[in-house]
Amino acid sequence: MPANDGLYETFDKRFHSLMIGIAHLDKLADGCVWAEGPVWFADGGYLLWSDIPNNRILRWMPETGVSVFRADSNNSNGNTRDRQGRLVTCEHLTRRVTRTEPDGSITVIADRYQGKRLNSPNDVVVKSDHSIWFTDPSYGILTEFEGSRAEQEQGGCYVYRVDPATGEIAVVVDDFVKPNGLAFSPDEKILYVADSAGSHDPEAPCHIRAFDVVDGKRLVNGRVFCNIKTGVPDGFRMDVNGNLWTSTHAGVECYAPDGALLGRINVPEIVANVCFGGTRRNRLFITATTSLYAVYVNTTGVQRP
């Protein structure tokens, strides 16, 4: 049932324990064209996110508001932090995954697989063993809007793992149509990956899949975790109890570890991605089309640097 003037919709009573009845949706920034890739820097007390078509990474701080963190971001999309706290970014224009070093220099983590250029890396996570996992759909090479139109060199749209010791890149899943957001369960025994192919083909997949992680390197037992009925799934994050908070066209939907839809936070724009942040990691930051929003929730995001 709707709550708080329509902010929440509850589909399972378990959602009541996750929402805060007096919380409201705060708009923190606007003026983007397609806002994506939020990542919280707890040590700096700020949020970074991508504005893909405007080719920039923006920063929001509670004290000072919005500023440009990086112009000419190579149409950056997904962002995360590695275990040393460094920014790891997916770039559409250059078709690569990069790391920003403490001195501001850029290190290329991955730009080719078997000698061929990647499509347009979309989203990325870093496991506790320092391995880097990312998705590589073709959105950034389909048009000039969020990258540069180009021929696809890879034979498909894959999910990759970068070995932390050798830098070797390996395909871990090869049967997605358009792999997109991804996140590990709190214990890292499951990797969740969205397939957002329904954005361009109504008959294509529009769901989030789950895979068991074997030996920290391989994925097995792939299955559909949940089907998204309100647009396509894009980016998502996990809370400490294993609930999955995903972007949809209607807002942010929360799914229990058993795959049940618990509830929805309604957002007035199409949501692309989310992340937990704030001093207690209980504030959900939401990148949605032209804007950055935030809402307090009664849970905590999985701890990251």
Per-range role (PLM):
Residues 56-58, 96-98, 158-160, 207-209, ...:
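A short loop-to-beta-strand structural motif that recurs across blades of beta-propeller domains
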Residues 51, 60-61, 100-101, 163, ...:
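Structural recognition of the beta-propeller blade-terminating site
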Residues 210-217, 297-304:
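Short loop/turn segments immediately following beta-strands, especially the blade-tip
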Residues 17, 42-71:
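Beta-propeller domains
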Residues 24-25, 65-67, 105-107, 167-171, ...:
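Predominantly a core beta-strand signature of beta-propeller blades
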Residues 104, 151-165, 207-212:
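Beta-propeller blade signature
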Residues 1-26, 54, 303-305:
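Blade/loop signatures of beta-propeller domains
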Residues 22-24, 30-45, 72-91, 96, ...:
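Beta-rich, blade/repeat-based domains predominating
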